[in-house]
Each structure stands twice: as structure tokens, then as C-alpha cells.
């Protein structure tokens, strides 16, 4: 069997003498792994940095077995452009670790995340853009994997205006007036997550990351008895203003 596709590099690990088992998110096949002969060599190492997009071909006997990747060319080198931006590098590490931890090999949901992930990665050089986009991407990750939040209407009244909080129990939005008696037990819902025209206010990114992180940890990683990847924890600490 064989196929060709573009893939976002999620990571890799050494195998044997100079080999590399490469982990990628492909446009059509979702998350896939394959062996790249000589992939750990100094000459080839740079193109396999996490976050880069490469054109590759996969060959194997059976689709569910580890096959071989032949890399045709590097489509986009992103990692090297972020070397002087620790926050963007932290976001890149969080993105790839969440995809590696949240997607199974060949998971069809991976294909639905390819374009959104490409868009986010391409914006990591724009510090005024990517933080809000990143939080929206995490919401999309939850939705694509069947753990989406319901932010369309109030869980109590059914109203679709004035939504200010999210219930940690149900993942549903709550209107401000209904949320008031329980506000200390709810997550704040930043306006930019329900209205794309809303300004991103101070504290909104941190609030958004706490919201999505809770459900990613509890619903996605909790289902397999794992916590959030440490890369995701480091991102929250890096972009959360000190108290």
C-alpha cells in the first residue's frame, strides 16, 4: 500500500542507526507515523522540526502497520522563524503535544483539524493575533474529538445573549443573571469566544486557556487517565500575567 500527502510534523523519535520514527498530522489521513531512514542525521534533522509542513509518501504492507515515509520536500519551515519568540515556541509545543496526545493513529478527526492547525501555525509570528486564535483552536480540538462545549445558549434560561460563564459540570454556557449566585464555581467565558467581533480584553486569554484546559484535561485526557501535557501547562504559565 502507498499514499502521498502533506503533513505537519508533530515530533519524532530515534530508531536504530540514524533512523527516525516520524509523527505527522496529514491533510487526508489524520495522524500517522512512519520510519524515515536516515531521518535523525544532522543533514535532515532541520526539516523534521515540530510544526514544519512536509510533502511525504507512505509505503507499507498494511495500512494499520508502521510503514516507511519518503519525504519529497519541505513545504513550510516554521520552527526556525520562532527561535527568538519563547511564547510562540511554547504555543507550538503545546499544539503538537495536544495533537500527539489527543489523536489516535489514523484518527479521522485529525483530517478535520489539519486546516485549522495550519492557520494557527502560520499566525504564530503575529503576537497580537495568535493567542486568541489558539484558544479558539483548543475549542475546535474539543469539538472535533466529540467533547465540544455548548456556548450557543444559556443552560438555565435558554437565552442566547448575555452569556458570561460556563458550567464545569456540563460544559454549557450560563447567562450573567443566572450565573451570579454560583459565579465562584463557574468558568468565565471571554466574549471573543462567542462573538468574533468582540475585543480581546486583558485577562481574556488566560481565562480562555483555563476554560479549555479544564475540559481538555477532564474530557479528553481524563478518558485515558492522563493529565494535560506539560507543554500545555508551560504555555499557560508563560502567557498568564503574574498575580
From Swiss-Prot:
Record-linked Gene3D superfamilies: Nucleic acid-binding proteins, Recombination protein O, C-terminal domain
GO biological process, one term: DNA recombination
Lineage: superkingdom: Bacteria
Keyword field: DNA damage, DNA recombination, DNA repair
Gene Ontology CC terms, in alphabetical order: bacterial nucleoid
UniProt entry tagged with the keyword DNA repair: yes
InterPro entries for this protein: ARFGAP/RecO, DNA_rep/recomb_RecO_N, NA-bd_OB-fold, RecO, RecO_C
Function, in words: Involved in DNA repair and RecF pathway recombination.
UniProt family annotation: Belongs to the RecO family.
Name of the protein: DNA repair protein RecO
Gene: recO
